[in-house]
Amino acid sequence: EDARQVIPHLADMFGEPFADSSQIPTYLVSKITREHVTVSLSGDGGDELFCGYNTYYSIDRIWNKTKRIPFPVRKMASVMIGAAGEVRHGGLATRARLLGAETIEDMYLRSEIGEGISLVKKQGKTGAAWIPDVWKEILPWEAGHTIMDEYPGGLLEVPQHNLMLMDLLMYHPDDILNKVDRTAMAVSLETRVPMLDKDVIEFAW
């Protein structure tokens, strides 16, 4: 019941659609915390800095197995498998998406975004034609620029380090830090992120 009561207030907190369901529990935790303190510490950044997500390792294993197959062959197989209606969802659909990855960074995004990867790529080609006209009028949309353009990829020798860097440059500021700051400030709770201290980041890298 507490969670449902938060939903009508989400638009006030974020000012725009924000597709992270943990925004609700984060708000509730912040609200309880604010009853006792005015400043709190967040552990965000630890997984991205010290390779704490299992996905970093699993994607590396999958990539090492699939990269031996020529990309055109993988891409064709991905399209053929994904075209079958009965495999649009579930494990087989996920494998089809991963097969179509051109780089390990692309594969990581496909694993995290899921079916949304096709929309992300379509945005750059069609000028977001899939977005309802009402949203185009409310929010200006810059055609030809997608999340795929934010990170050049392959900057670091260790594959997992590239995935960690992707999260630090995109997922962390655009999702995690945004979510924590907005939900906490909605109850007048300030947050500090010691893991993102300059010295900690330099030590991690």
Segments and roles (model prediction):
Residues A19, G154-D167:
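Structural motif
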Residues D2, V6, V158, L169, ...:
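N-proximal short alpha-helices
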Residues Y57-K65, I147-E150, M164-L165:
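Charged, low-complexity, helix-prone segments enriched in Lys/Glu/Asp/Gln
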Residues T33, L168-R182:
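Short Ser/Thr-interspersed hydrophobic loop/turn segments at strand-loop and sheet-helix junctions
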Residues E1-W141, R182-W205:
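ATP-dependent adenylate-handling active sites, centered on carboxylate activation for C-N bond formation
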Residues L139-P152:
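A short, charged helix-loop
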Residues T26, G46, H161-L169, P173, ...:
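Short runs of predominantly hydrophobic/aromatic residues within well-ordered alpha helices
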